Amino acid sequence: MGIILFVLGLPGSGKSAAARHIKSFARRKKFQARRFKDYTILNKMFQKDMEAKRFRSTRRQGYDGFDVLDFNVFDEALQKLHHDILRRKKLADNSRELLIIEFSRDDYCEALSFFSSLGLRYAHFLFINSEILSCKARIKARADHPRTLDDRYVSDYIFEAYYKRDQQQYLKTAIQFNQRFGIPLDHIHAIHNGSDITVQQFFQEVEAFANDILKIKV
């Protein structure tokens, strides 16, 4: 059995950057790292929503993206993400497999219930914490000057309409994970990525965290 890692946090918090860095770091350590994220699924759902009943384009705002109007699609996307993980190509030796699962939600306890078949009590969790103003600033910067496929636009609307429920009280969330799913508290970690943190400092913390969880298999 390999390692399952959930990377969670608000859009613009730095979770995608963290997930990419962990994947690269793990491969240098000879792990078979695979990353699963729900954005691709949501984007496909948006493209199929020809009548714009569940999504709305953000082209009027000058960006190629979408807003979610029907929040039920968030659950549907997680169901599909779970399905894709279960149907992934199996490795001959999965002992050094690292599955990185990445998404943002307003209620992580409810979101995690879609992944109960993965053996959550053995999984690891990394929350990326950042002020909303910092998240929005990063989103604008990355949308104006994209450098990776993760550099997508997210509007202010979805922060106000949906993500406002995520108060980023991740210590409280950790206790809920422990009580509901039996996840050990020492499997849950949070990294602050506010405006006072440099990119180098952030990646140093991310790498130290990744090194700790990968040591389990060394």
Region spans (language model):
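Hydrophobic anchor at the beta1->P-loop junction of P-loop NTPases
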Residues: 7
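Short, surface-exposed basic-aromatic patches at helix termini and helix-loop junctions that form
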Residues: 22-28, 112-122, 140, 144
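Glycine-rich phosphate-binding loop used to anchor ATP phosphates in small-molecule kinases
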Residues: 63-120
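NTP-dependent small-molecule kinase module
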Residues: 164-218
